[in-house]
């Protein structure tokens, strides 16, 4: 089977690079590189968010995406194939009080994805993808009536075909699963 799952700290470039070498040694170059790891800050005005919490959020949400792309992309470019899907958020296109660090990290993902799309060979794709509003622990931490939104399991059934149907004309776009 052409799947592999492993828990790792994506903020650790060395760990991500070792994992990528392991994957590339076992399988062909990936058709899809999906970057979905993220954390959210505890609700607070920006000036009250502890430096360590802000830094760790950026390390995971932004640098983790970069680490994964940097570790896989050279091989993908060598074969001029692959779609890179970087999970963003509605808050990567708008803002909300109490979650400025999270919003800023998702705005970074939007910019990173668009810039990357301009650097890739014509046969490759990079998009920022907002999953829409889903009932998750992350949303629940914001006290936003998360239980009134779609459950992750039903969302995944719609998301998989959506992602598999991302086309070359979508390159550089900010997409949303609605």
Which positions does each model-derived feature cover?
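Active-site-adjacent segment of SDR/Rossmann-fold oxidoreductases
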Residues: 94, 115-124
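Substrate-binding pocket helix/loop in short-chain dehydrogenase/reductase
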Residues: 44-46, 53-55
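The beta1-alpha1 cofactor-binding region of Rossmann-like NAD(H)/NADP(H)-dependent oxidoreductases
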Residues: 7-18, 51
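Conserved NAD(P)H cofactor-binding loop of Rossmann-fold oxidoreductase domains
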Residues: 36-42
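Active-site helix of classical SDR
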Residues: 69, 105
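C-terminal helical subdomain
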Residues: 122-124, 128-129, 134-136, 144-178
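Residue(s) in the substrate-gating loop at a strand-loop-helix junction
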Residues: 89
């Amino acid at each position: 089977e052409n799947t592999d799952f492993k828990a790792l700290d994506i903020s650790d470039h060395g760990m991500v690079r070792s994992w990528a070498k392991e994957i590339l040694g076992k399988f062909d170059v990936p058709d899809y590189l999906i970057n979905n790891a993220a954390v959210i800050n505890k609700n607070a005005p920006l000036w009250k968010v502890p430096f360590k919490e802000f830094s760790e959020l950026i390390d995971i949400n932004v640098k983790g995406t970069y680490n994964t792309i940097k570790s896989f992309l050279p091989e993908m470019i060598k074969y001029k194939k692959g779609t890179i899907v970087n999970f963003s958020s509605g808050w990567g296109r708008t803002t909300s009080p109490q979650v400025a660090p999270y919003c800023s990290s998702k705005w970074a993902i939007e910019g990173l994805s668009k810039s990357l799309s301009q650097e890739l060979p014509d046969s490759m794709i990079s998009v920022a993808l907002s999953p829409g509003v889903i009932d998750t622990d992350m949303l629940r931490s914001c006290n936003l009536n998360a239980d009134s939104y779609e459950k992750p399991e039903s969302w995944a059934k719609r998301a998989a075909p959506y992602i598999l149907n991302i086309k070359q004309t979508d390159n550089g776009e900010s997409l949303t699963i609605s």
